[in-house]
């Protein structure tokens, strides 16, 4: 199982975690600096190698894990996961 899937599921299912405290950063062509950051609560589903999120226009987008650069707790500043070779 991909380590990122474990982290996403932990935030979703662990009652001690609050999804409101997390953001996910990923490569998104066309966004400023090709990077997009979304609040964790926008995530709708997690698969074996991807997640889907719902944007402001209620469109669902699938993001493969290889495009994710980090998962961060905004309350504590802790980075739960970071892609190798990427500075956050």
Residue ranges and their predicted role:
Residues 55-88:
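Short, compact, well-ordered microdomains
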Residues 1-60:
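N-terminal recruitment modules of adaptor/scaffold proteins
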């Amino acid at each position: 199982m991909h380590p990122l899937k474990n982290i996403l599921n932990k935030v979703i299912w662990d009652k001690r975690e609050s999804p409101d405290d997390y953001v996910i950063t990923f490569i998104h062509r066309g966004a400023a600096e090709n990077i997009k950051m979304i609040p964790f609560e926008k995530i709708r589903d997690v698969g074996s190698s991807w997640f889907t999120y719902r944007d402001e226009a209620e469109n669902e987008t699938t993001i493969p894990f290889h495009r994710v650069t980090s998962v961060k707790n905004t309350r504590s500043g802790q980075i739960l996961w970071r892609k190798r070779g990427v500075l956050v």
